[in-house]
Amino acid sequence: LAGRYSGVGIWLRAGIGGGSEISSLKKGSVAKRAGLKVGDVIILVDNVDLSSASVNEVAAALRGKAGAVLKLSVLRKGVEKK
């Protein structure tokens, strides 16, 4: 695959209740600037339901060409945030 690919600056782990939970945020990352927080569970990426996807599947959905825009929805303390 040719081109530059990038992530959003998060580390994931399997969530206790399922899904993929943010375990760490890179300082100064796009994710941190967008307001994501440790403990958020990623449930949608670009309107694709990832609530029961593996950590690897969620990580793959978050990777893309540098500068690409992603729309995320997360669960934060049981409340959906977009």
What does each of the following model-derived ranges do?
Residues 1-24:
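PDZ/PDZ-like peptide-tail recognition elements
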Residues 4-6, 38, 54, 58:
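Generic hydrophobic, aliphatic-rich segments that mediate packing or membrane embedding
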Residues 6-8, 34, 66:
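Short glycine-rich loop/turn motifs that provide flexible caps or phosphate-binding loops at active sites
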Residues 13-17, 25-28, 47-48, 65-67, ...:
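Solvent-exposed coil/turn segments that connect beta secondary-structure elements
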Residues 20, 30-32, 51, 80-81:
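Short beta-strands and strand-coil junctions in structured, solvent-facing domains, enriched
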Residues 21, 43, 57-82:
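PDZ-domain C-terminal substructure recognizer with occasional recognition of PDZ-binding tails
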Residues 31-54:
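Conserved PDZ fold ligand-binding element
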